[in-house]
């Protein structure tokens, strides 16, 4: 309706063919294109006022809460048998990439929210907006409020630290295991990593210190992303039928790892040992190289160094 309360129809605002032709002729003027293209790199006054450091490398701002230098190139390569690992999460079927790495608003009371507020940040924004800050994304790993980790009674980003059985956030547990020098695995059911092909779902898994994900089946793209981050996907039978409780110590033999090869997995609880034959979901020779190098970035870095 217009200001006088009369109804306005599409036909009233639809441009005539003459108006369309006039604007078309204006936009198709070659002189307009030429004048704009000649100054395309000059920018306006605000663009010209931006301070740009002269450097061949990006000048990382350590105070930034949006973009931080990620640790991908500095992390140590730890390929080899996985021994004495603990289960960080015990999950059911259809765990999505949003369960693994949420993209929505950051809860002020979440681990990531508390971290940002301690830095004096008032507008927390979303995980998606802060995906350039690995410190935020790491704290957001498996922090989806709807996640059900079967190691604990409550929903959300919680788990148990073993052997003490203390309940804490997934982030806190991962850091505690890191201090103790304990490698980690995740055990899940069918269709692990379904949903959108979110790269941070694989990145945060690696950042949490997870060496392998053991599941009944994997979503295609997430499986590939895990391999690219140096995390080994292993298919195993339904863990619920194996008698696994989640407090076991896990050993995985990888000495003779091959493409889609068999992998021996042991779940040890006291004197009890459950032996499982898994299958490495490393589907090509190049993926095998990625896993052995600790991920695709390290593979590329090492290749460039050797060629140089």
Annotate each language-model stretch with its function.
Residues 1-308:
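Fe-S-dependent hydro-lyases/dehydratases of central metabolism
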């Amino acid at each position: 309706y217009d200001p006088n309360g009369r109804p306005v129809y599409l036909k009233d605002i639809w441009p005539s063919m003459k108006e369309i032709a006039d604007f078309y002729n204006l936009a198709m003027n070659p002189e307009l294109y030429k004048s704009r293209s000649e100054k395309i790199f000059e920018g306006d006054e605000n663009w010209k006022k931006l301070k740009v450091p002269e450097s061949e490398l990006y000048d990382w701002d350590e105070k930034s809460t949006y973009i931080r230098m990620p640790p991908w190139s500095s992390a140590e390569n730890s390929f080899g048998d996985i021994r004495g690992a603990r289960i960080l999460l015990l999950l059911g079927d259809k765990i999505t990439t949003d369960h693994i790495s949420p993209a929505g608003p950051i809860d002020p009371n979440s681990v990531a929210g508390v971290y940002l507020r301690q830095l004096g940040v008032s507008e927390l924004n979303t995980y998606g907006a802060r995906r350039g800050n690995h410190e935020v994304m790491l704290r957001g790993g498996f922090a989806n409020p709807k996640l059900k980790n079967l190691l604990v009674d409550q929903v959300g980003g919680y788990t148990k630290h073993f052997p003490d059985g203390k309940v804490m956030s997934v982030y806190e547990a991962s850091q505690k295991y890191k201090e103790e020098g304990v490698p980690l695995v995740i055990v899940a059911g069918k269709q692990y990593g379904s949903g959108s092909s979110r790269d941070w779902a694989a990145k945060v898994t690696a950042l949490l210190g997870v060496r392998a994900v053991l599941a009944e089946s994997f979503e295609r793209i997430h499986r590939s992303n895990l391999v690219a981050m140096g995390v080994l996907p292993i298919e195993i039978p339904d863990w619920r039928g194996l008698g696994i409780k989640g407090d076991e110590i896990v050993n995985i033999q990888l000495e003779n790892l091959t493409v889609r090869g068999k992998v021996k997995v042991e779940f040890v609880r006291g004197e009890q040992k459950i032996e499982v034959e898994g299958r490495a979901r490393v589907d090509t020779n190049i993926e095998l190289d990625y896993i052995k190098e600790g991920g695709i970035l390290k593979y590329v870095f090492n290749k460039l160094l050797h060629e140089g």
